[in-house]
Structure formats: C-alpha cells, structure tokens
Amino acid sequence: VYHAGNWILIILASFLIPILEAALAVTGTLYAATQFKTAPEKFSLLIIQIATVGREYELVQTTINKIHAYQLSMPYQIWVVLEPGFRTDYQGADEIIVVPADYTCPPVDKARALNYCWKIRVERGLARQDIKLMYVDDDTLPSRRYIELGYAGDYDICQGPTIPNRWYAIGGWQHFLMSHLDDPRARNCLTYCSTTQGILGKPLFVHGEGLTITGWTENRIGWDFHIVGSDDLVFGTNAAHQGLKWGYFNAAIQLVSPWTWKEHLKQRHRWLWGNIDAIKNHTVMPKNYGLAVFIKYIIGFVATAISFFGITLLQSGVIVVSPTLQNLFYTSLALWVVSYMVPAWIAAGGEPNRELRPQWWRYWGFKITQALAAGLMTPITAFAPMLVIIYCYFRGRPERFVVIAKNNKFTGV
C-alpha cells in the first residue's frame, strides 16, 4: 500500500474533469434557455434541405411528412438533393435537385451536393440575410421546436444538440449497443457545444444535422473547401474565424444510430479522418480551431486512461488518499455516470418514442430502463470510443465519403 504523493495530483486532475464537465453542461444549458436571442421578424423564408445519396427514399419521405404535419407558422420550403439514378418522386418536396454526374468542384460527395445547391441559391437571389437554411441528413428529423428556434434565432449560424432518439435502442442487441455508443454524442453537445458555440461563439464541435444558417452566411463561407468529410466542422469553424455570430439552443435534432457494429465503425472511420484532414490542412480549417480539436482528442484519451488506472489503484487499495480526496473521487465518479445517464434519458424520450409507446407506463418505463442501462454501461461507452479511434486511425484514410444504411426492418418505414 502506497500513500499518495504529489504524483497523485495527475490522477486527481483527471477525476476533476467530470465535475468540470457537469458545470459546463449546466451553465451552457441555462445560458441557452435564458440568453438565446430570437428575432423571427427578420426572416422571410426557411429552406429545409435534406441531403441524401438517394437510397433512403422511404426514410426521407417520412421526414417530409412529419415536417408538414407540424403545421409550421413560418414560410418554408423543403428541398431534397440527391445523386442521379435514384427515385425522385418525393411527395411534399418543393424542390427535388439531382446533382449532375459531371458536376465538378473542389469538394466531393456530400460537400459537392452542398456546393451545387449553394450555387443554385446564389443564382436565384437567395443568398440573403432574411433567408434561413436548415441542413438535414436523410436519417434526421428536426423536432418542431428545433425548427422554430432555428428559424427565429438572431444569429448567422446556430444549432441545437443531436439526440439519437429515432428508434433508440430497439431492434436487437447490436442497435441497443450502438444507440448507447451514441450517448457520448449528445453528451458532447450538452457539455461542449452549449458552451463553446452558445457562450463563447467559438465551436469545438459542429454537426451537420440541423445546422442552421442564413443565406448570406452560406455565400460568405461557401462550400469550396477541398474536403471529403467533416464539411460541417470546416464550415462552422471558418464562420467563427471570420467573426460570424454563433448561437446554440435547447431543442433536439433527432437522428438514427447505426444499426450494426460494422456500420458504426464505417461512420466513425469517416468522421475521424475527416477531422484529421481538416486539422492538418490550415487552408481548410483555421489553425487555432484545429489545434483546439486536437487538444480535445488528446485530453480525452489521456484523462480516460488515467482515470481508469486511478480507479483501479484506489479501489484495490494500492494507493491511499485522505477522506476529503476520497469524497471528491466518489463525487466525480457519480457525476461521470450521471453524465451518460442524462443523454440516454433524453434520447429515450421525445415524440418518436411517444409514438412507439403511447401508453404512459411503457414510455416512462423505457426512459427509466435506458437511463439505468446507460449508467451501468458508462465504462463501456466511455472507453469504447478510444478503441474505435485507434482502430480507425490504423485502418487508414478513406478515399470516399462512406455512407451507412439508415433504414431497417425495425423502423416499420
């Protein structure tokens, strides 16, 4: 048994991170609830743009139907942009845009489609301050509140948290696990997006699902970056770098988690290398933002490893600390577990799950069950991303924007 010396401060510093993150999440959420500025009278039209390769016709059609069912009060249009060779008979879409196969520009794949639609809006005179654009992927559904706040937000660029609550944790053990491995996404939004986007206006993370900007913002930043992935992070950090006004609001952009472990790895592989390419290329992503993202990766790796090591030493009695530090450790441990339970509690709720479980006892029982499951799985959901990142890094850079299957027999769509 060793009595802790000065070196234990390194372990204790790692234990303090969950306390700091809890403070950030509470502060950011309260700030968004009280300080998010709205001015709907400044805007005349909302364009909700759904980007898809074209394989998820049924899922996209469902999203269109849901949005129309909201009976939104603002003037809006739904644009669907897709690749050639797929169905184009979307009902309720105001614009169906097929990107020509021979269209060329600096970015490729999804960012190429964004580039093409941007040029169309410029030609039509829609690159204006009074036009709002909301980017939606083929697996995502903005809640009614999300659309209303995104449209009304008096910002050049804004968004709310991503919540994987569409068919959350159903359809077999793989999707149950993949859903909970998406809990850190919502956790990062609630903790870091709420503060870096909402309070500081200097984003550390940016997600393309639900990103809401003005037509003027799109034309100011543009989609001419030489990128394959991480188009959202590149766009958002460049907007902040050029002094555009960032905002964050409390409403859910609802998405579907990967259905299998294989699809999960494909998705993370694309994300990791998109970030690496952006961080390395200072002509694409501002150097200081790239450095911040890199440091966050390193801190996450080191702190998680040291924390697991420290927990083992403390619980096994190899090292002994004072009762005060012991209490600090248990407080931090409790907050760490709660920080994964809260996203699961949110993801297990919402309108998508109310539709699946109309009886109150099923709805609330599911929320409680998933929150408890997330608490028990905290070591897995915290540690697994480290292993996934290592695997994806050594797998090498993907040459294309890898798309995963979003629909499944369990959706009933």
Segments (PLM) and residue ranges:
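N-proximal low-complexity "stem/linker" segments adjacent to membrane-targeting elements
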Residues: 1-62
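Long helical/loop segments within the catalytic core of UDP-sugar-dependent glycosyltransferases
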Residues: 104-124, 146-228, 265, 269-280
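Acidic donor-binding loop at a coil-to-helix junction in glycosyltransferase catalytic cores
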Residues: 229-235
